[in-house]
Amino acid sequence: MVTAFLNERQATTEEMALVSNALAAYSFIADQPERAALYFVCGVCLGLVLTLIALVVQISCRTDCKTQQAPKKTGKTVENTSDTSDSDSDWDNTSDLSARRHRRFERTLGNVFTSAEELERAQRLEERERIIREIWMNGQPDMPGTRSLNRYY
């Protein structure tokens, strides 16, 4: 009976603490709305940054793990059949690492344009921008003051 009363009283105090904390938060927001808004925006921004970091780490780890698993299987067969010196194998490992990084970079570039039409459209846009830049550079009016300063202009 006494334990039931203590448990009920403890539950009541926990509920009262929750209500008290909610009222304290409301009074803080009512007294200082700018500060509360600043804390809210900072919390949202921090959450977005942490989510972005988690996504970047997940994507980079996923691509690194996939590229590391494939060479391990082929690397054992290559090590058993090769009779080269240690310096040559070190050079092979570094070149293999750079080749893997290059392939990963090319793979990300390849995923940007999913179809040939998008690739062609992007190339036409780049060409158009280059032509506009050339027209802009060549179409500037000649200023008499700058011509007299440099005879090779």
UniProtKB/Swiss-Prot annotation:
Belongs to the EVA1 family. Residues 66-97 are annotated as: Disordered. It is found in: Endoplasmic reticulum membrane; Lysosome membrane. The chain crosses the membrane at residues 37-57. It comes from the Eukaryota. Acts as a regulator of programmed cell death, mediating both autophagy and apoptosis. Keywords: Apoptosis, Autophagy, Endoplasmic reticulum, Lysosome, Membrane, Transmembrane, Transmembrane helix. It is a single-pass membrane protein. GO terms for biological process: apoptotic process; autophagy. GO terms for cellular component: endoplasmic reticulum membrane; lysosomal membrane. The keyword Membrane applies. The lineage of its organism: Eukaryota, Metazoa, Chordata, Craniata, Vertebrata. This is Protein eva-1 homolog A. InterPro entries: EVA1_A/B, EVA1_dom.
